[in-house]
Amino acid sequence: MPSIDVSLPLSLRKRAMLASALNLLAVFASQVMRLGGNLVITRLLVPEMFGVMAIATTVAVVLQLLSDVGLRPNVIQSSRGDEPLFLDTVWTVQVIRGFVLFLLTLLLALGAKFTQYIELWPAHSTYAAPELPMVLALSGFAAIIYGFQSPKVDVAIRVFQQKKVVIAELIAQFVGLIVMLVAGYLTRSIWSLVAAGLLSTLVFTVLSHLVFQGPRNRLRWDPAALREVFDYGRWILLSSSVGVLAMQGDRIWFGGSMSVAELGVYSIAVAILGAIQSVLLRLAGAVALPAFSEATRSGDKERVRSLYYRSRVLFDLTSLFACGFLLTASPLLISWLYDDRYAGAGNTMAILSLSLFTLRFTLAHQLWLALGLTKYVAMDNIIRVVSLFILLPVLMAIGGVSYAIWGVALHTFFTLFLIFPVNRKLGLLDLKREVVVLPALLIGVFFGEMITSLFT
């Protein structure tokens, strides 16, 4: 079976470094657009609209992850990841999944309308917002569009040829940004957010077929490839199904206990923090996973171990510094960026920034995926969701929403009881290296305090 022709003239290290630099530039440009658009649109729309959109986004993410069988990681990790028949099998599964997700979203939209009709929710609840059912229905169409995205994008990531990926993503985001701002200015409605999301997804899907190297995708599948997809993806499916509750459980829970405006303010804090998280997650998925996978296929365990800890340096220093800095400087940053309606997001973001302490172990998850040890990723997510859904109701009962936010920030710390033993078993635990980076946290706290003192 012929493969897609991709040349690899550079060493793994050089290709990973180039990919890292490219992705950092891409994330920076993306976050500038996102933050700039966010600052403008929050002045055009009222906080309640962001609360409704937060629920719609949560529903979309939940459904995506509940049906996630790891198609992209499979393409990146598999020895068959550049074979046209294998890629067509992946694409066919992805298309079918998109239609199924859209139908499920429509059912949830009808369910939301019915619960409003019988007045199941308190009048102040986000779930009682009259726009919610239609926002859900229209936003769900993005699942169909995304389903047609070409797996040639995944091949480009697999071999570190990511320039086109970055350009396509930025073009799609820019189109969505322009649509959001123009429609927001003209209509002052939540539909500007919905339209922006749909058009951005459509643009990237079209570009994925037009600009990436490889034969045209066809709807077909190979039984052997299909078995490999589901054998690899079964633990990822469990992991994602459980992990989605950990990732989105706070908004699901707060949707019933916060007012629409409060959830809108909370979503602003989550979005700003998410901008930092996305930098690390982007590098993990687009650089670390392909690098770990290639090193793993070589069979050199010492090379894998060395690559893991070299990669950890940037992640550890960045996440620990950001954790300390935002812990002390978040209220000031929010006061600079937003008007008084969003002031409450400052203290919320300060608390949530503690989650950055454990985000640095994302690289362990990527290494487990590269080694095919997807069951450990599933176990990690099980710990997250159990911890979150124990802490949320307990802290809510003790001190209300303000206490429950601490549960969102701290629930990931329980995963360390899995990460350290597993990495020790794999010969990847070096306590000296784990400890030596911790001063970056204190340096971040110091800089945050210093800037806050200077400007308040």
Show where each model-derived region lies.
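Membrane-water interface segments that mark the loop-to-transmembrane alpha-helix transition
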Residues: 3, 14-31, 56, 65-120, ...
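Helix-loop junctions and terminal segments of transmembrane helices
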Residues: 66-83, 88, 157-158, 269, ...
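Short runs within selected transmembrane alpha-helices of multi-pass transporters and secretion channels
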Residues: 26, 30-34, 38, 56-60, ...
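Interfacial segments at transmembrane-helix termini and the short loops linking adjacent helices
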Residues: 112-138, 317, 326-357, 402
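Membrane-interface "helix-start" segments
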Residues: 19, 89, 164, 228-235, ...
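Helix-loop interface residues and adjacent transmembrane-helix termini in multi-pass membrane transporters
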Residues: 44-47, 159, 186-187, 248, ...
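Interhelical loop/hinge segments that connect adjacent transmembrane helices in multipass membrane
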Residues: 2-12, 16, 121-125, 191, ...
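Signature of the first transmembrane helix
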Residues: 2-3, 12-71, 102-117, 137, ...
